[in-house]
């Protein structure tokens, strides 16, 4: 037996729309669609031997690179990324860097701090090519899943290196970015 249900909206008994279907068949789940992007708005210099948090982030929007955020957005303040919507998030970080020093490596940490506790995240190193009086460029990627269950949960990005290098960024550059994508409800 085949049945066809024709609807434009699906709502719960209180009237909150859980899903809509447009004329092209695209399904929108307003309670589940959430993605926020940020870009590094200035070149960030990582000094030799010192662990440093990155703080130069600007939220993307339709003016900045045509990326409108969807749903409940993340916010940023002083190197801390937070959200008001609990859930499991896929966090994707891409760093573009350059160095004219013999940096050899960079430690890039995506740190998650649950509800005011201690940061969780390991040392993740990338090799940076040794140069001889020339500039070397490198791209590093990190993807992590974090379970946000409290309003005080936060993500930070920390770096250190053996010799100074620059993480690229600027108001007209789309080089270094971080995205937060909601993938499911929180696990408690």
Per-region residue spans from a language model:
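Extracellular beta-strand-rich recognition modules
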Residues: 87-97, 138-143, 152-161
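Terminal (often C-terminal
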Residues: 23-103, 112, 127-128, 165-188
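Glycine-rich strand-loop-strand elements at beta-sheet edges
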Residues: 74-77, 117-151
